[in-house]
Swiss-Prot record:
Taxonomic lineage: Eukaryota, Metazoa, Chordata, Craniata, Vertebrata
Name listed for the protein in its UniProt record: Kinase D-interacting substrate of 220 kDa B
Top-level division of the source organism's lineage: Eukaryota
Record localization: Membrane; Late endosome membrane; Cytoplasm
Region (Disordered): 1362-1554, 1574-1643
Organism: Danio rerio
Gene (UniProt): kidins220b
GO molecular function, one term: protein kinase regulator activity
Length: 1680
């Protein structure tokens, strides 16, 4: 058909027809066709209206067009027919219409596609069905790729069409041009239904398609699990590979299809088939990171050592991927860990490069070799250390054998060790420790010495610092001071070595020298050759020289590598010319005076003695060697000639201040030039005229010149000789020759030689400095003084002082100050000793800047960096220091002075920094001086002290800055002065702060000092260290001085950087307390500051009173309320119970162990305790107490109840609840501690026969701790309630619970009793006595108020008041007196035990401060134990012991010497709680026990105390235990008046005693007992445990001890334990009085105490003590 013609004939009408067809406007089409007959008109692309209508699916139009005769088989330019268009678009009806009208069903378009192909491609199921039914060919193919309809249908997922085609005969295994079958196409996209139809129709599963892919491979690649499963059911060849050699398993493994991999493995796939690159399935899985697949493959025994591409194994790939889990799995199969890649890397090397610590560890565990090397020769160690990985290096070196690899070089010659050394921060030292810690190690500032050395170097190189200065580097022997010396030396050199190299300059000297050179050349040539030639050559040389000088001059000032040679020549020329100039100046010029350093700071240089060459320190020869090394250093620095010629040409003082040295009023250099001129002229004349007899004139001139020169030489023969001598003989030679002549010179002559040499050296340094405008400082380092012979130390110090006290010397002592001071003390002559000058004063006088090395302090300082407030005084704008502070920080002086400023500073920076420091230092010293001198405490300051203080302030300031701690200079100055003048007392303050938590920063030191002052020894006999402190009154004035008042914050800020305070002082103080702890078993805590809660016993909670400043130390410090005691016996080994006066304002929770355990308190005690809680709302007290009584909240309830339930029950307001809760928790804590520590107590505790077992529980624990050895019996097992109820008619007193804590009993009362101790006691001042007296009066008054129902306010402690001093005890009479007085106190005679206890307690009277005296509502001043106003502590309620007002303090009796000795020996812990079996049968024993008991008493102060405290009921003869319980319950000791009358010598009214009969022993009482009471020992704090029951008897401890010990076990009438003659005692508790009965009828026990110390004639003393008061503690002495 002629298509072209038809197209050209297209008309507008045809276009209209097309538009109507497009719009599907049938009517318009009809109208148009009616009008125009042309049906088959064509569009531009050859389409007919029928094709368009078929494509659009407009059936009616199609029908209309066919009816009008349209040709159904026409095609367009693309050979598309109407049928193809309709089939493609899926218009079934149109297809049917066309087929009915004979459309050609197999018509192909230009691509060879039939209508069926299009229907299959497009998924037109209905169309395909119609076509197939009408006979379409299902196996037709396209022209280009020969793709069958079924392939299109399968590949595109048209499952129904696939099924249709298969049903109509389509080939199931047909393939396209590349051999890809329908099954492969269907599997490729995972069309499951298509695959199923194909498989059901017998599709071949192993046919390969494009790229050799089978259906299985493409299905696996697509991850179509279901398809794969179906394919595998057809048993395909699972090992077929694609074109890259990948099997289905390889592909699945790489892609991570775990389930498919498992299916394939189950189907028997080979696991070790490699791909084309050689990688196996396992490697593929590993590279993909698929752990489960790897495990599956390993389970199927995949080969793990096959090498893939680049020789990498699966293990290597796992390492490279960093997958530790996979590595672990592979390693379990024992792979070869040493296979290498093409780069010779093993898995271990790769793991190390990747820094995979876990993988490295796994490989090493599997035995991988650390010695493997890569192609560069690097081992894993090289790599780890180069990568700075400490952990890796540590792992690699864990086998010591591999340490050798540190020194194995790689191909470049690097060893791991050298690589490490080349880095600033070594990692090998972190692994092995500082194997090569050396002073020069810049990276190893492990000792914190960098800051010290930098700060010191900064000060010593400060231009304004005026030598001589002596620095003391103090540290314990062996602490590495020598390291610091080397560091210090290096630092000083870097601080000083910052001068710029001088460059060549033209000067008169250069001109003169060049002329001389040329002249001499001319002379030589003139003599030898022709004079004219000589002149020409010399002038040429001169010209060349100056050209050379000019080039060097300008070239050295040019930048750039090419001019380096000029700079080198310029500096060398300058150096040599400068040296020549120096030599000439030495000969002809007087040295100029150095300018004032404040106007112009000259650079500083240091010369050091080589202290390492000293074989031994001490002795003249070593000093000579030291000076010799210094002279060697001078020669190295100043030059060989200058130093030796100085001896000849040194300036004499007679020269005056003129510039030139003169000879006969003519400057020497003029004479020299004249002679030199004569010489040169003569030579010139000789050269020109020769020696010619004809030339008279010349000859005359020559003769005259020769005579001038000759005369000059003759006159200076002596000088020439001196020059020759000094040049040949160095200073070192002279010193050695002097040392060799020691036997002739003697010591004095030798010292004179040394002195001359040192002065010459100093003068030389000063002279050369004048010429060179430098400051030279000669540093003499003396190391090892602490290891030389003691007798040489003083001599060495004197020598240093004599030799180096003038001139530019800096002496540095590195030594252990304690050893040195000890050596000085041994060797000081008697005159100095008599004038109270000791080694410490001597060293202080010599050393201007002490530095105690304390690296711990510095490290802690780092925690207080910049954020730290400026010591709370930032707002204090008054004064220069604020301004200076601000300036310093703003100028970042802190940064610039960071002491590391080494040579990296360029010249300008250095200069600026120096200027800044200089101005700061100047301002600081000026203002500090003004500040310090205006202060009162500085009135007696000497210039030397001032200098020392300023030096220390300067160093400390630098260290603070280095740690970025902000501070104020005036506070720092005050602190330094405090530590300088009173180091010992300051150490006490610091120790207190270190050991006590929660002290607010604002607390001023005065407050703290008041708390601990009484703990500090007052006499040097007791504490030799007191010698190092200044006047104590000045110290107190200083602490309260107006500006600035130092506070706790200041200590915390300054302490880490304080260099002048010996840290060992605190150790000594602590050690002393610890020692005393062992001796005394009981301690006293420091008083807590009112502002904080007391803490439970601190570390030192039990100190032996023997050593501690207070007689007994239950803790590091007194209880919050305890006013510290005088310390006279601080080191004397005496111990005494602590005096119990309490300060009122103590924290609600009292630190220290309570005397009474919480669980043993009754409701009344609880009520009393609540009242005593600091800060509780007093208006609501009545409501709270009512609640407590109503709910029956007693101690046992509080110790076990739920706190939340308690809160609901108490219904307190928030604040009160917090205070109450804290108090309860504290008491619980203390009880737990006590019970824990004293678990053994129950066994040892005295079990009172009839006391219910429950009693024992609570108290026992306490009791036990106190007496260890002998006091098994002291443990009281009575519960508090039982004790309190025994025979009490009134509510128990809870006042001083503290005394109860037998646990804290200080065992060494005995020592108090020693003669020595009593002597010491006598040393107490009257003032203290007066304080005691007043305090005691107040105490009695308060007790009387407290004593609610008591007829007689007899505080058991009163009895204690009467402790007889050891002297008294020694005197039998005294003892008896003491006893009597005690008995007086109560009509009952207390078993001597009681008395003992009492006396012991009495011994502990503390001085009472005024604040102590203000006792709250009767919380008596007595601070029992540590608890503040004992009430806080469990108060032993039941007893009389209700001390008045807070349980008046008890006075304990001092033990006698024997007792003391025994006690000290026994110093048992109550814990031992040995059973009373130890009843002492004989007095000796008794006393021993006594001592021990006493010790335990220290807790309780006496047995009775012990007993009373805990299970104190005396075992009365009848039912001792019952009685005891009763007696204890009735802690109240009522003394019979008759007894009191009996007591001898007790004044009826002891000061403040209300009832003469009761007459508590007052400190002021005249009686010997009272004397005891008032004796200094009173000042000893009584131990916490006091026997409440104890009667005041003064009987000696021995009696008490024996009696009580006996009592513990003793049979009622048995006095077997007691050797003391005990008459039947009257201690009887009426049967009617049950332990629980409120009233106890105390029958007086009549006891005869036999005092061990009694003189043979003394009659035994009989004391009556209420049974209540009798305690078991010393029941060993039986109470009959």
């Amino acid at each position: 058909m002629d298509t072209t013609t038809s197209i050209k004939m297209t008309t507008l009408a045809i276009q209209n027809l097309f538009s109507y067809v497009e719009e599907e406007n049938l009517a318009a089409v009809k109208v148009h066709l009616d009008k125009f007959k042309e049906v088959d008109g064509r569009s531009d692309n050859g389409q007919t209206p029928l094709m368009l209508a078929s494509e659009q699916g407009s059936l009616e139009i199609v029908q209309e067009l066919i009816r009008r005769g349209a040709n159904v088989n026409l095609d367009d330019v693309d050979c598309w027919s109407a049928l193809i268009s309709a089939a493609k678009e899926g218009h079934v009806e149109v297809v049917k219409e066309l087929l009915e009208n004979s459309a050609y069903i197999e018509h192909r378009d230009m691509g060879g596609w039939t209508a069926l192909t299009w229907a299959s491609y497009k998924g037109r199921v209905e169309v395909a069905t119609v076509l197939l039914e009408n006979g379409a060919n299902p196996n037709t193919t396209g022209q280009q790729y020969s793709v069958y309809p079924i392939i299109w249908a399968a590949g595109r997922g048209h499952a129904e069409i696939v099924k249709l085609l298969l049903e109509h005969g389509a080939k199931v295994n047909c393939s396209d041009k590349y051999g890809t079958t329908p099954l492969i196409w269907a599997a490729r996209k995972g069309h499951y239904d298509c695959v199923m139809h194909l498989l059901e129709n017998g599709a071949d599963v192993d046919q390969e398609g494009a790229n050799s892919m089978t259906a299985l491979i493409v299905a696996v690649k697509g991850g179509y699990t279901e398809v794969v499963k179906e394919l595998l059911k057809r048993n395909p060849n699972v090992n077929m590979t694609d074109k890259d050699g990948n099997t289905a398993l390889m592909i699945a493994a790489k892609e991570g299809y775990t389930e498919i991999v498992q299916d394939l493995l189950d189907a028997g796939t080979y696991v070790n088939i490699p791909d084309r690159s050689g990688d196996t399935v396992l490697i593929g899985a590993v590279r993909g990171g698929h752990v489960e697949i790897v495990r599956a493959l390993l389970h199927k025994y995949a080969d793990i050592d096959i090498r893939g591409q680049e020789n990498k194994t699966a293990l290597y790939w796992a390492v490279e991927k960093g997958n530790a889990t996979m590595v672990r799995d592979i390693l379990q199969c024992n792979p070869d860990t040493e296979t290498t890649t093409k780069d010779s890397e093993t898995p271990l090397i790769k793991a190390t490069k990747m820094r995979s610590i876990e993988v490295v560890e796994l490989l090493l565990d599997k035995g991988a070799k650390v010695s493997a090397v890569d192609k560069r020769g690097d081992t894993p160690l090289h790599i780890a250390i180069r990568g700075r990985s400490r952990r890796l290096a540590e792992l690699l070196l864990r086998n010591p054998k591999d340490g050798r690899l540190l020194y194995r070089p790689n191909k470049a010659g690097e060893t791991p060790y050298n690589i490490d050394c080349s880095h600033q921060k070594s990692i090998l030292t972190q692994i092995f420790g500082a194997r090569h810690l050396s002073p020069t190690e810049s990276d190893g500032d492990m000792l914190g010495y960098d800051l010290y050395s930098s700060a010191l170097a900064d000060i010593l190189s400060e231009p304004t610092m005026q030598p001589p200065i002596c620095v003391g580097l103090y540290a314990q022997w062996g602490s590495g001071k020598s390291f610091l010396l080397k560091k210090l030396e290096d630092e000083m050199k870097t601080f000083a070595g910052q001068q710029v190299e001088p460059l060549f300059q033209f000067s008169w000297l250069v001109v003169l020298l060049s002329l001389l050179l040329c002249g001499s050349v001319a002379l030589v040539l003139g003599f030898t050759v022709d004079p004219k030639l000589a002149i020409a050559i010399s002038l040429s040389i001169l010209a060349l020289l100056y050209v050379f000088f000019v080039v060097v001059y300008f070239g050295s000032r040019r930048e750039g590598e090419s001019w380096n040679w000029a700079w080198v020549i310029s500096t060398r020329l300058a150096r040599h010319i400068g040296y020549l100039e120096l030599l000439l100046k030495l000969m002809f010029v007087n040295p100029p005076e150095l300018p004032e350093q404040t106007t112009r700071a000259l650079p500083v240089r240091f010369l050091f003695t080589d202290y390492n060459r000293l074989s031994s320190v001490g002795g003249e020869t070593s000093m000579a060697e030291m000076i010799a090394t210094l002279s060697d250093a001078c020669e190295r620095e100043f030059g060989f000639l200058a130093t030796r010629l100085f001896r000849v040409f040194k300036t004499e003082d007679t020269q005056g201040k003129k510039k030139w040295k003169k000879t006969c009023c003519i400057p020497s250099f003029v004479i020299f030039l004249f002679i030199l001129g004569c010489l040169i002229m003569g030579m010139a004349l000789l050269a020109v005229f020769k020696v010619d007899g004809q030339n008279q004139t010349v000859n005359a001139v020559l003769v005259s010149m020769a005579s001038v020169v000759g005369l000059a030489l003759l006159l200076n023969c002596r000088t020439w000789w001196q020059v020759t001598d000094s040049v040949l003989n160095s200073q070192r030679k002279r010193l050695h020759s002097a040392a060799n002549k020691m036997h002739k010179l003697k010591s004095e002559g030798f010292m004179k030689v040394l002195k001359n040499e040192v002065e010459l050296m100093a003068k030389m340094a000063k002279t050369i400095d004048g010429f060179t405008q430098n400051q030279t400082r000669l540093v003499v380092i003396i190391d090892g003084l602490d290891s030389c012979e003691q007798d040489k130390v003083l001599q060495m110090l004197d020598t240093v002082r004599v030799l180096f006290s003038k001139g530019p010397f800096i002496s540095i002592f590195a030594s252990d100050p304690h050893i040195i001071i000890k050596a000085i003390n041994q060797n000081l002559n008697s005159v100095l000793r008599d004038s109270n000058i000791n080694g410490h004063d001597y060293m202080r006088n010599i050393v201007h800047l002490p530095v105690f090395l304390n690296s711990r302090g510095l490290s802690s300082a780092k925690k207080m960096c910049a954020p730290a407030p400026a010591n709370g005084e930032t707002g204090n704008s008054e004064g220069w220091h604020e301004e200076l502070d601000r300036k310093l920080s703003q100028n970042s002086l802190g940064d610039q002075t960071k002491f590391g400023s080494k040579t990296t500073l360029n010249r300008r920076d250095t200069y600026r920094r120096r200027q800044m420091q200089r101005s700061v230092t100047r301002q600081m010293s000026f203002d500090l001086t003004k500040l310090l001198v205006t202060e009162d405490w500085f009135s007696d300051i000497s210039p030397q002290t001032m200098r020392r203080l300023l030096n220390i302030v300067s160093v400390t300031g630098r260290l603070l800055r280095a740690n970025q701690i902000s501070f104020n200079w005036d506070r720092l100055a005050s602190w330094i002065n405090l530590t300088e003048q009173w180091p010992y007392r300051t150490s006490w303050l610091i120790l207190y702060l270190e050991e006590t938590d929660g002290i607010p920063d604002q607390t001023n030191l005065k407050t703290i000092y008041e708390r601990i002052s009484k703990n500090i020894p007052t006499t040097k006999d007791v504490e030799p260290l007191l010698e190092i402190d200044g006047d104590v009154r000045s110290f107190e004035v200083f602490l309260s001085s107006r500006t600035p008042v130092l506070a706790a914050r200041d200590i915390r800020t300054f302490l880490p950087c304080t260099v002048n305070l010996d840290p060992k002082l605190r150790e000594i103080i602590a050690d002393v307390r610890a020692a005393r702890e062992q001796v005394n078993m009981a301690g006293v805590t420091y008083p807590t500051l009112p502002l904080q809660e007391g803490r439970p016993i601190s570390m030192y909670s039990q100190q032996s009173s023997a050593c501690s400043p207070t007689a007994s130390f239950n803790g590091p410090y007194n209880p919050p309320g305890v006013s510290p005691q005088p310390h006279s016996a601080y080191f004397s080994g005496m111990a005494g119970p602590q005096h119990p006066f309490y300060n009122r304002g103590s924290a609600s929770v009292v630190s220290g162990t309570p005397s009474i355990l919480l669980s043993s308190m009754s409701t009344d005690v609880i009520c009393e305790r609540v009242k005593l809680i600091d800060g509780i709302d007093q208006n609501l007290i009545s409501q709270y107490t009512a609640t407590i009584k109503k709910a029956n909240i007693n101690g046992r309830v509080l110790s076990q109840c739920n706190i939340d339930e308690l809160k609901k029950e108490m219904n307190m307001n928030f604040g009160d609840w917090q205070l109450f809760r804290t108090s309860v928790l504290e008491m619980r804590h203390v009880e737990n501690q006590v019970l824990h520590e004293e678990a053994p107590s129950e066994q040892g505790s005295i079990t009172v026969g009839h006391v219910e077992p429950c009693r024992h529980a609570g108290a026992a624990a306490q009791g036990v701790a106190g007496n260890t050895d002998t006091s098994p019996m002291y443990n009281f097992n009575l519960s508090f309630e039982e004790l309190s109820n025994v025979g009490l008619e009134e509510p128990p007193r809870h006042v001083n619970a503290t005394w109860m804590g037998t646990t804290h009993r200080t065992p060494s009362m005995s020592s108090l009793n020693s003669q020595e101790s009593s002597n010491e006691i006598c040393k107490l001042t009257d003032k203290q006595q007066a304080e005691y007296r007043n305090a005691y009066e107040d105490y009695i008054a308060s007790m009387s108020q407290l004593e609610l129902g008591m007829e007689k306010p007899v505080p058991p402690f009163v009895s204690q008041l009467m402790h007889s001093s050891s002297e008294d005890k020694k005197k039998d009479g005294n003892d008896q007196d003491g006893r009597k007085s005690v008995s007086k106190r109560g009509s009952t005679k207390s078993g001597s035990d009681n008395t003992d206890y009492a006396s012991a307690d009495a011994a502990t009277l503390d001085p009472i401060t005024e604040e102590d005296e203000k006792v709250d509502h009767g919380s008596s001043k007595s601070l029992l134990g540590r608890k503040t106003s004992g009430d806080k502590v469990s108060l032993f309620q039941g007893a009389d012991l209700k001390l008045k007002a807070g349980g008046g303090s008890r006075y304990q009796k001092l033990t006698s010497d024997d007792e003391e000795s025994e006690e000290s020996d026994n110093a048992p812990l109550l814990k031992d709680g040995k059973k009373p079996e130890a009843k002492a049968s004989d007095g000796g024993d008794r006393s021993l026990t006594k001592g021990k008991d006493y010790l335990s008493d220290k807790k309780d102060s006496s047995d009775s105390g012990v007993r009373s405290n805990e299970s104190s009921p005396n075992h009365s003869l009848q039912d001792e235990e019952a009685d005891l319980s009763q007696s204890e319950r009735a802690n109240l000791i009522e003394l019979d008046e008759e007894n009191s009358a009996r007591k001898r010598g007790l004044p009826n009214s002891l000061s403040g005693l209300q009832d003469p009969t009761i007459a508590r022993m007052s400190i002021c009482s005249e009686d010997q007992c009272s004397l005891l009471a008032s004796s200094p020992e009173e000042s000893w704090p009584s131990s916490k445990s006091y026997n409440l029951n104890r009667t005041p008897s003064n009987t000696t401890l021995n009696n008490n001890t024996n009696a009580q010990q006996g009592n513990h076990i003793r049979q009622p009438s048995d006095s077997s334990n007691t050797t003391s003659t005990t008459t039947g005692s009257d201690v009887i508790i009426n049967p009617g009085t049950s332990t629980t009965s409120a009233t106890t009828q105390n029958e007086n026990v009549r006891v005869v105490h036999l005092k061990r110390g009694l003189n043979p004639g003394d009659p035994p003393e009989i004391l009556k003590v209420s049974s209540e008061t009798v305690t078991f503690g010393e029941e060993r002495e039986s109470i009959l």
